[in-house]
Each structure stands twice: as structure tokens, then as C-alpha cells.
Amino acid sequence: MSGKKKSKSDTVPLDLDNIKPLDHLQAVPKTRKMSMTSIESADEPGGFKEVLLPPTIKEFDELEQFEAFVRDETWDNDFDYFHGRLHYYPPFVLKECHDEIEKIKPTSNKNSSKFKRNLQHHIKKHLIKDLEKCCGYELNFDKAEEIESFDKLTWKFKDETDHGFSKEEEDKYDRHWKIELDITSHNDSALVDIDMKSIPIGH
């Protein structure tokens, strides 16, 4: 399931310096019930249980659009239930070629130690910090798991912490969630793929 959606980000420009943090949790939106489905229960033969469907995947090709989408999910009280994908040239690549895509060096890919170093810097010093502002709550990613094959290199980040909220507040509204962030670079292109999921825990 994937789709593009018109959202607040079409009318409200992204301003990373003026995003209001999420101070308090609220009840799960009533619309979440529409994302529930019944499946046969393995515990009770012939019985059924309610499960939450995976969130619809939203696709983006610009970093600012993607960050605005993450911000909007918090504004819409869906910070714990979204899935976004971004396919983009990182800012350091665009800066090096002066925004002329056809001038990107063919060596700008996961096999270049310079590209890899610049991408890691972009992720740690900019991307994750900016995504934290857009989320409106703390992101506490552990050291990324690094998976490399011949054609791609993926860093897998995961945050299963309380995101800066108290356990009591999370329990009160039943808002426990984890964030998964996968960042992939390829051996034949400077394009980078980001896959970010926020998923309720215990549903």
C-alpha cells in the first residue's frame, strides 16, 4: 500500500527553527479504529482478534517534503503510526554538483569512502536532528546496525525508548511506540533511500 497525500505541508512551509515540540501525549485518534482488522487467533481456534494494519506508505523525492510529512503526522496526532519513504540526493551531493544532477560524479556512491563519510556526517549532524525537531519528541537511536552487500549499504536505526515522556503518561493514553529508520546507499548512484516507520508497540 503506498500513496501520496495532500497534507498541511502543502500550505505550511517547513521551518525547522520554529516547530513546537510535543509537550504532552493525547488519546489515540478515533480514526485509528478504521485501521483495525480482524484475523484468526492462533491462541483460540475459531476465534478472532483485532489487529492494527500497517500504516499506508507515503513516498517522497525531496527531503523537505519528507520532513514536513513527519511534522504533519505529529500535528495530526499520528506520531506513533506512519510510514514514509524518501528517495533523494543528500544536500552534500547537490552542493558538490551545484544542483546540476547530470554533473554528479559517477564515483559518488557507497563504494567511495568520501561519499560514505559525508553521508554519515549528514545523517548524524543533520538528518536525525532535523527529524527529531519534526517529530516533536526525543529520538534515541542506538548505534546503527550496518548491513552491506555488493550493491548496497544500509544503516538500520531503532528507538524503542519512552521518547522523553513518562511511563505514566504513555500508559495513561496507551501510547507506546517504536521508530525504525533505515538509510540505504547504493553502488551505482548517489541517490539515498530513507525508510522511516513509527509503529505502536503492543497492538
From Swiss-Prot:
GO biological process: energy reserve metabolic process
Pfam family, one: RGI1
Record's subcellular location: Cell membrane
Record flagged with keyword Membrane: yes
Topology of the protein relative to the lipid bilayer: Peripheral membrane protein
Keyword Transferase listed: no
InterPro entries, per database record: RGI1, RGI1_sf
Keywords (A to Z) from UniProt: Cell membrane, Membrane
UniProt signal peptide: none
Coiled coil: none
GO cellular component, one term: plasma membrane
Family from the record: Belongs to the RGI1 family.
Function: Involved in the control of energetic metabolism and significantly contribute to cell fitness, especially under respiratory growth conditions.
Protein name (record): Respiratory growth induced protein 1
Annotated gene: RGI1
